[in-house]
């Protein structure tokens, strides 16, 4: 077994894991960030949209409405991360271009001193005062503290997390570059029906899906979508047949208002990824009874994660009084997990 020197091991190198790693490094904490080597992540195919006003009356939504300022501060500290102001009515919005974010995260994490490793985590094993991770290839690491921030991948490592997390599949069309000198407009649905579908996930007796027709700039191209598919009860599943799901998405786009309707026949690659959602509506950020920490289940991750990552870093690594204060704040925001132990 390799006894990792990292003070904190984070499983998942998407938005949640990366911003938590940066927040921990600001506190001088050694960090090992483990990311599976294959496939797109939910971060890669996210719209990256950040509303500038609260979308519900919860304390978290009120605080997350200021996320654009946090992104601006992150970019002043680390350089361009893809955050851009966007013109959109009736709501003030900004967006993180996830193509640019993906290009920049690796170098930014390296510059911050985060140890990054491409390796799939196969299993967790409790051992003494820390958890050991079995990695693909036979290696084992045992960081002093462990955070699961791998989205839907968390469910494969700790099945009991299904009490608080469900799985959906998100499908989008990755569109080719727009005409020279042009870019795709940002068009969002007036409401996201995905949230209502997730809210009734436990009652689903068969798979169900919805399409929230929208379009965002994505690198030089665009993302059109989004299809959301849930298995019965929102359980872990292999997802829908991609060809069939692409047909559902294109049919829904064809009935949407212009300019979305024209995208129904557009060239573009259909892509789908598993996504973790919170069964209680609020994300989960905190320590489980068995000692593993969880950072997952976001609704609007690009607004919620930048707010919560520094608080979770403080709860993990600050001196006792400051750590307790951070935990109280996470509890007040309603995100501290109330789940039984992993293992």
Model regions and ranges:
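A conserved short coil-to-beta-strand element within the FAD-binding core of flavoproteins
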Residues: 117-131
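C-terminal catalytic lobe of FAD-dependent flavoproteins
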Residues: 254-343
